[in-house]
Every structure is written in C-alpha cells, then in structure tokens.
Amino acid sequence: NARNRDRYKEFQKFADINRDGRLSEEELDRRDGLRLIKGSNIPWIDDTADGSKGSGLMHHKFMVIDNQVVVLGSANFTMSDIHGDFSKPETRGNANNLLRIDSKELANHFKKEFNIMWGDGPGGKPDSLFGIKKPSRKIDYLIVGGAQIRIKFSPDPEDTPREQTSSGLISTAIAGTKQSVDMALFVYSDQFISTILGERQRDNVQIRTLVDSQFAYRDYSSTLDMWGLQSTQDCKTGKSSVWKQPLKTVGIPNLASGDLLHHKFGILDRSLILTGSHNWTHAANHTNDETLVAIQNETVASHYQREFERLYQGATFGPTAKLVQATSKTCDERVKSKPQSNTEESN
C-alpha cells in the first residue's frame, strides 16, 4: 500500500550512503536494522511464528534488560518515530513517551509476556502465541519505589467482562477522577471510554483532549462525541454518544509537518497516568498485542503534565467546517459513502 511504499522510499534514502540510487550489500549491512540483527546471530521471530499470517498487530514497544530494567511506552524503535524522517530535516520525530523502570518484579511481568510470544524461539516447536491466540491475563498490581502500578496486556476475547480488559482499566480509572482528565492520543475511537468521560464532564471534571490530526476528524472518531457531533459509530449502533455539552478543549497539536502525535497517555487528577502501546480503540483491546500501565505517582504525572501542556499550547481546537458539514448528512449517506477505515492501528 501507499504507506508501506513511502516507508520503503524513506529507508532507501537513508540506506543509500553513496547516493547512487542502488542499495549495495555493504550499505544494507550498515543500515538495515533486521539485517544487522541477523548478521550478529541474534535470534528473532515475527508474529507469524504462531502459524498465523499475523493476527492483528504485534504492537508492543518494550524491552526487558538483565531481568531488571523495563523500557516501555508509545515510541516505535524507528528513526522516523524518534528522530524524524531522514528525507525531511524539518521533522523532529513523533510526539512520544518512554519510561525506564528499574524493578525486578515489574520485569518479571514483562518477561512472562515476552515468553508467551517467544515460545522456544525460531524453529523448534510451533509454541509461540500472538494476538487472539494468547491466553487472557488479569490486571496485575505492584508497588515500585512508592508508586502504585497496574499492568495489563492485550488482547482479550470479545466476551471478556469489560472491566477486566485494558480499556476497562482505562474506564475504571477515569470513572474515579474528581478534578481533571488530560489526554494525548494518537487515535481515539472507544465509545465506552467516551461515555465514561461524558459522565465525568457532567460532574464538572475538567477534560482536555489532543488527538493526532490524521484521526481527530475521522467520521468514527470519539472526538466527534466531545464536539457534539454524531459519529458513524453512532449510526451503526443506533445509540447516540453525542455529548450534550460540547467541549471547546478538544483539538489537535500543531507539530512540524510530517510529525505525528503518537502518544497514548492520559493524566488523571494530575496524579495518575495511563500509558503504553495501547491506543484507545476496540482493536487494541481485542485484537492486538498491547501494553497498558497505570502509574499512581505525582512526580511521574508531573513529567507527563509538562509534555501535555507543551502540546496543548498553540493547539487548534474544535471540528473543521468540512467535518460539521459531513456530520449533517443522514446516517445512511455517511455509512455508505465512507466505511470505517482499518488503518487506525498502524502505529
């Protein structure tokens, strides 16, 4: 598809060291990350190792180092996501977050998740499990350095009680807020979370939301609920999730051209953060391999608050005129002319 073609063109420009328009074996040995891994005899598998063609997305972004240190967050380990596009020097890299946590107990939880997917590694038995083939796991609780941490790995089957899923953890945390909810999200389309947020708004909880510009104005985005507009999700379910008191604090950040808001975090009452690889979507909850952590700690929350304020300053708020016009059409017209895209989980 066009997205993959663009990615390959970007890689070509980066790997073509002598600029002759061709990629030599020497250039690939120096610039191709997977080739470097293979050349170093580091074992690797992908999410087809369970015998499938890759179910959903292997969307994790974590490392476990020496069974002691965990690195996790929203950042893909790519040049574009962290540093910016090689061919576009004006880009700065996507807006992301990473956490480094030194805890053997936490590392054990992530090592278990890794081992479920790894099985016995390349070759050998077909015992790797990805996506919906993995067993459902409960929410785990632990204390690290005075911080209360909850961990949840996805996906969960569709019939799993909502509160036991990752999106359920998000919803439960939001339901307990008293003062504020600030969210910076790549994509946001979970209607149940939107409903819980609407309930908190009616109880005078201050809500501010930033969503990446690629998704904020999509017909199915839950930003539409917050703006008082009907989404195509409402059309399909026949239930209205439209907020009766539209928000003026929902919009998109102004980033360098080509950069994305790739965060997947929420800050609740300036003391609890929700972060990880988990986009706030149905696919993240029930299809993809994902990580979600909830950390109760004011110091950690203050770092995320600073990042949110940086993005919020100068943001563009409210729906576009084009979106308002589009939502004025009947549901039949909208659903038939513009089916929901499946690209929401590509990051």
Annotate each language-model stretch with its function.
Residues N1-A175, D212-S271, H278-V293, E298:
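HKD-type phospholipase D/PLD-like phosphodiesterase module
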Residues D203-I207:
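A short helix->loop->beta-strand "cap" motif at the edges of active sites that frequently abuts
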Residues F186-F192:
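Acidic-and-aromatic substrate-binding clefts and catalytic sites of carbohydrate-active enzymes
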Residues K38, Q201-R202:
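Anion (oxyanion) recognition and catalysis
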Residues T172, F192-E199:
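A short acidic, amphipathic alpha-helical/loop segment
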Residues I45-D46, S180-L185, T209:
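Short catalytic-loop micro-motif centered on adjacent basic/acidic residues
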Residues G251-N254, G258-K264, L268-N347:
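Long, C-terminal catalytic modules of enzymes
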